[in-house]
């Protein structure tokens, strides 16, 4: 077995297998496609790649190379710890940031982890709701062509506002830079209009619009933002993963 640097194209079929196994939103999916953001490593058996590891080296991770994906074909997971340590030796990362629904990456990173923390919860849709807010109307502020382009290019998104009596009281939207067909919903309610169910209503309607656009809604929230957590849950979202981070010790 060997671990060596690789181009994304070499591990594309393995990434496709990883996506199928995840069967949900992958928060860090777009990092692979951003030029210069990731160092990819192939784990090879003979002349064939049987796994890969990914280290983020740009953006928020510019000064702290960070493992965010590690994948092995199922037949080679009996050697998972050995191969993960070989990947660490080859890539020399300082930290990790993984989605706990990615069980292999999570298990491997936690084995070598120090200073573990979590700051975001990932949600998936589980129920259809029918909340209403008296006098509220939803208005799209992004041109339809721009939304369609964002869906196709997996970059950007669309934005909507909630208006009451002609005044904008909340803003939200969906982003598409995730694995197809998933989108990420976000929202913010102006302070004077909070605790009235407007956030829940907005999330509910953004979910509906996601499906109309052919996307599957997902969402994220800070672990400390209790009002947002409540709004997401009331709109039919359930938590299914954390984003864990920490530093990595050496094998």
Indicate where each model-derived feature is located.
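Conserved acetyl-CoA-binding loop-helix of GNAT-fold acetyltransferases
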Residues: 76-89, 195-210, 229-234
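Acyl-donor-binding surface of acyltransferase catalytic domains
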Residues: 57-65, 69-135, 246-248
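Short amphipathic alpha-helix that is part of the acyltransferase structural core
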Residues: 1-27, 117-159, 165
